[in-house]
Amino acid sequence: MATSRTFIFSNLFIFFLVIATTYGQAPAPGPSGPTNITAILEKAGQFTLFIRLLKSTQASDQINTQLNSSSSNGLTVFAPTDNAFNSLKSGTLNSLSDQQKVQLVQFHVLPTLITMPQFQTVSNPLRTQAGDGQNGKFPLNITSSGNQVNITTGVVSATVANSVYSDKQLAVYQVDQVLLPLAMFGSSVAPAPAPEKGGSVSKGSASGGDDGGDSTDSSDAERTGFGFGIRITTVAAIAASSSLWI
């Protein structure tokens, strides 16, 4: 009997000890920290140059703030690979002002979350954080056929290679070209205007040349007339001298 009671009390002691230990433990760690665009790209790899641009323009901080805001509608980011940046003409980025670099990054960000299937039903041009495409400065058009999504900007055409990351707030897609907006790069790809026939391209210089030509011609005329007068005077003097001898 005593042995049975001892066994029961021992079990009760162990039971309460386990409960006390369980409730006394620190809570399990919560989910990972807030969404961080650069951390996502670093984990994916091959986006070093885009990450550098995000950080130098502080666009990464703005994106992270928007993603973790309760009023956010989500974001869509088109991330060019390092190969895409390396294929740019030398000095392309260095020729941009700080404000233009910010706009270039913003042109790669849509202010809403768009999943891959939704690309088939979007209305063009899409609005980016750089501005409204309706004004013709930052147009971004999407065409989708099956699993292939193509992007055109009026300057370059790019293809969405794959989905890098997606959740309820953010979608990141890998693109094979840097998306160059028309507002900043349109003139660099537009063909040079062909010269008009008849030399009308240099009308301004031609009119200027006419003025210059008139003054030159009049000077020549003056010089020619002056020389002609000297020759006449000389001939007359010789004739007069001859008549005296005769």
UniProtKB/Swiss-Prot annotation:
The keyword Signal applies. SMART domains: FAS1. Residues 34-179 form the FAS1 domain. Expressed in the sclerenchyma cells of inflorescence stems and siliques. Glycans are attached at N36, N68, N141, N150. Residues 1-24 form the signal peptide. Keywords: Cell membrane, Glycoprotein, GPI-anchor, Lipoprotein, Membrane, Proteoglycan, Signal. One of its GO terms (cellular component) is plasma membrane. It is a lipid-anchor; GPI-anchor. Residues 220-246 form a propeptide. GO terms for biological process: plant-type secondary cell wall biogenesis. It is found in: Cell membrane. It comes from the Eukaryota. SUPFAM superfamilies: FAS1 domain (SSF82153). InterPro entries: FAS1_dom_sf (IPR036378), FAS1_domain (IPR000782), FLA_A (IPR045003). Residues 193-222 are annotated as: Disordered. A lipid is attached at S219 (GPI-anchor amidated serine). Pfam families: Fasciclin. Coiled coil: none annotated. May be a cell surface adhesion protein. Belongs to the fasciclin-like AGP family. PANTHER family: FASCICLIN-LIKE ARABINOGALACTAN PROTEIN, FASCICLIN-LIKE ARABINOGALACTAN PROTEIN 11. This is Fasciclin-like arabinogalactan protein 11.
